[in-house]
Each structure stands twice: as C-alpha cells, then as structure tokens.
C-alpha cells in the first residue's frame, strides 16, 4: 500500500486532483486511492466504463475509434482519459482499457493506459501498453497499481 500512499502524497504536494477512467480494472484504481487517508483531497471522480456504449455515452469515446483500433488500444485509452478530464474538474486523468483473459484479438494481460494532464488551457496526453501475467484477478490488480504508480 506504500506505493499508493506515495501517489496520494505526490498529488497532495503538487496540488493535483485526479479522475480515473477504468474499463478492465472496473474501479480498482479509484478503490485503491480510497484506501488511503486524505485521498478525498486529491480524488475528484472515477468512471467505470466497461461497455463501448458507456465509453461513448460518459466519456465521448468515438465509436469509430473503437471500431478502427479495438477496445484494447492506446487510442481508446487516450480518448477515455481526455473524456474523463472534460467530464470532471480534475487536473490529471488516468485511463485503463485491456483484457484480463485471452480473446480473439488480444492476449490476456494486455493493458493500455493514457494519462491526460491540463496545462493551462492545453491537454497533454501520453499513453502506453503493458503486458501482465497471471489469472484474471491478478492481472486486474497489477493493472490498477501500475496505472496509479506511474503518476509520480
């Protein structure tokens, strides 16, 4: 838990507020933050958007992006992070989309992330794809921790 405490400390020190946009992790990132005293100062909101329709409806992820790049893609993660920033008052957003089990398109454990930050009036976005091993539960836990621990 110390690593998540460091994330909360970092956000407090830098006076940043966070929103999460989670698909595969189903709210685990926000839940991990909620375990830490003082998280209420830095956690603005969390979006759990598992289905394509929820991604579109709540975060304005374009169906065309989903169709072209697939649900497990940095492009979708980027639109999720930007959508979460736009739908909240947070300064930074982290998003996750991926697969915990093998499917027709992607190997189980493939996780895509995006981090969006407000810099004045501009949004800056970076993204990455990471591969985790283990069963469904282990992959989701690793994915949630990774998404948060990349912030500081």
Show where each model-derived region lies:
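Short alpha-helical segments enriched in small residues
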Residues: 1-152
């Amino acid at each position: 838990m110390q690593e998540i405490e460091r994330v909360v400390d970092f956000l407090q020190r830098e006076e940043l507020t966070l929103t999460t946009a989670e698909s595969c992790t189903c709210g685990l990132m926000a839940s991990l933050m909620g375990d830490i005293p003082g998280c209420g100062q830095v956690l603005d909101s969390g979006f759990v958007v598992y289905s394509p329709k929820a991604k579109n409806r709540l975060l304005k992820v374009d169906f065309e992006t989903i169709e072209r790049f697939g649900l497990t893609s940095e492009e979708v993660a980027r639109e999720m992070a930007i959508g979460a920033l736009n739908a909240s008052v947070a300064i930074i957003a982290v998003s996750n989309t991926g697969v915990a089990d093998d499917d027709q398109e992607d190997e189980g454990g493939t996780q895509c992330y995006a981090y969006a930050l407000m810099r004045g009036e501009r949004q800056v976005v970076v993204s990455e794809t990471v591969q985790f091993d283990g069963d469904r539960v282990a992959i989701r836990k690793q994915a949630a921790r990774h998404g948060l621990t990349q912030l500081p």
